[in-house]
């Protein structure tokens, strides 16, 4: 019991960006702006998809859930990081560590499966357009989305639960800007071999399965596109897949670089910033700027807003006179 209490009472210090005290204010402003734009962009995209009925198709349902998970990822990491810029102690408890890692792992794992389902959706749309509504029914879409969330939740709970078997009696300084699981293992005085084994057992198969799904889907798409005789058809197919392929490439390159072997946590910081903070910022723009349907819906909303604004102005004039 004493050992368990010692583990649960542990507190850690997030070193973060303390090596750059002269840039503290600038970094706070930059990351605050990124956080604000990320939340507005992702939650705005979610609202747009679920309010506009014609966007309630499998592709946009997956996209809306991806945006929701990007918001979750940003919320898990950024607020505590911003607080620590002006905090004297920068302390985080084990409970906070577990919660932070749980939501981050949930978001990243669910993202992996959602990106794979989006690749499969594009494969069906381009390679089997006549059977699309049969092969990608709303029921299947909901099941795939629910499955992605369940897998993310289970994966997170396993790793967070295994943290309870560790005790921390070494340095309590985490050389990172958030409470990631690998830096925690370095501080454990209990052998974390079982925890590390669970990463290999669960995380690596998830990566292999989702990456293989994406690669096979795009290989089939490329073979189908090259067989198309119409240049317009090829252009439309490439345009449909370009944003998703760009997002997938950035996500997996950063993720694979981050989970690669590293002895010091601070060496992971630049890559972690990119995959935990920058990617959630970029995704709404990657998917929206090249998407005619989303742009048309935005234009429609802006037109309605301008009409409403003009109507209110005219009504105010009548009230004045």
Curated annotation (Swiss-Prot):
Extracellular side: 1-25, 76-97, 161-205, 262-268
Aminoacyl-tRNA synthetase listed as a keyword: no
Transmembrane segments: 26-46, 55-75, 98-118, 140-160, 206-226, 241-261, 269-289
Keywords (A to Z) from UniProt: Cell membrane, Disulfide bond, G-protein coupled receptor, Glycoprotein, Membrane, Olfaction, Receptor, Sensory transduction, Transducer, Transmembrane, Transmembrane helix
Entry-linked PROSITE patterns: G_PROTEIN_RECEP_F1_1, G_PROTEIN_RECEP_F1_2
One function term, GO molecular function aspect: G protein-coupled receptor activity
Domain of life: Eukaryota
PANTHER family, alphabetized: OLFACTORY RECEPTOR (PTHR48018)
Protein name from the UniProt record: Olfactory receptor 5K4
Annotated organism of origin: Homo sapiens
């Amino acid at each position: 019991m004493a050992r368990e209490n010692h583990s649960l009472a542990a507190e850690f210090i997030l070193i973060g960006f303390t090596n750059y005290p002269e840039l503290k204010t600038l970094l706070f402003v930059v990351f605050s702006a990124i956080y604000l734009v990320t939340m507005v962009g992702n939650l705005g995209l979610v609202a747009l998809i679920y309010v506009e009925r014609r966007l309630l198709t499998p592709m946009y349902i997956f996209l809306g859930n991806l945006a929701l998970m990007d918001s979750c990822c940003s919320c898990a990491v950024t607020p505590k990081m911003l607080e620590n810029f002006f905090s004297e102690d920068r302390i985080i408890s084990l409970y906070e560590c577990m919660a932070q890692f749980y939501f981050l792992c949930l978001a990243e794992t669910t993202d992996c499966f959602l990106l794979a389902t989006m690749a499969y959706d594009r494969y069906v749309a381009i390679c089997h357009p006549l059977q699309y509504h049969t092969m990608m029914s709303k029921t299947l879409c909901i099941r795939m989305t629910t499955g992605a969330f369940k897998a993310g939740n289970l994966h997170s709970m396993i790793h967070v639960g295994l943290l309870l078997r560790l005790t921390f009696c070494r340095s309590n300084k985490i050389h990172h800007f958030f409470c990631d699981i690998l830096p925690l293992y370095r501080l454990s005085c209990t052998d974390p071999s079982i925890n590390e084994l669970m990463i290999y057992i669960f995380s690596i198969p998830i990566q292999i399965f989702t990456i293989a799904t994406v690669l096979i889907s795009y290989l089939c798409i490329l073979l189908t596109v090259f067989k198309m005789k119409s240049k317009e058809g090829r252009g439309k197919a490439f345009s449909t897949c370009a944003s998703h392929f760009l997002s997938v490439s950035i996500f997996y390159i950063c993720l694979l670089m981050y989970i690669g072997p590293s002895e010091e946590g601070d060496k992971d910081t630049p890559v972690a910033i990119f995959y935990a903070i920058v990617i959630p910022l970029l995704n709404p723009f990657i998917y929206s700027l090249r998407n005619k349907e989303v742009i048309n819906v935005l234009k429609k909303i802006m037109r309605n807003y301008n009409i409403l604004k003009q109507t209110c102005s005219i009504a105010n004039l009548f009230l004045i006179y």
